[in-house]
Design a protein with these regions (language model features):
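Short loop-to-alpha-helix "cap/lid" segments that border enzyme active sites
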Residues: 8-114, 118-120, 124-138
Length: 138
């Protein structure tokens, strides 16, 4: 289960696990600044994976992903080094930058959406080129 926002308290993570037996919890961390590292370290013990994405939950209307923008991959690499959870990388990944993103962060996996679409629809040519770029970098 992907959690695009924080739960109200640490206890809520355990409560969710009790309510949904066998659930895998993936906490999205919106990589904004140094505080994102602290947030990831704080929440990692309560979840199974972390997904690092662009967005800004601090805005009046929260921006919780799907922006098509990259974030600072150096911060993502620091989060990877500071936590023991498998890390998924998202946020503005495209054919022309996914290799650098993988080399910099060394994530467990990646999440892509807008970077493989044309006019809002998945584009098989972009998907194929993206996959080749991923395999070349891995």
């Amino acid at each position: 289960m992907q959690l695009v926002d924080r739960l109200a308290s640490h206890d809520e993570y355990q409560r969710l696990r009790a309510l949904v037996e066998g659930v895998t919890l993936v906490q999205v961390i919106h990589v904004l600044d140094e505080s994102s590292i602290d947030e990831a370290v704080e929440l990692a013990p309560f979840v199974d994976r972390l997904l690092l994405d662009s967005g800004n939950p601090r805005l009046a209307v929260k921006e919780l992903g799907g922006t098509g923008r990259t974030h600072d991959w150096a911060l993502s690499a620091r989060i990877r080094a500071a936590t023991d959870r498998p890390l998924l990388l998202a946020g503005g990944l495209r054919v022309d930058n996914v290799g650098e993103a993988i080399t910099t962060v060394r994530p467990f996996g990646i999440d892509v959406c807008s970077g493989v679409r044309t006019d809002g629809a998945l584009d098989s040519d972009k998907l194929a080129r993206f996959a080749h770029a991923v395999f070349a970098a891995a």
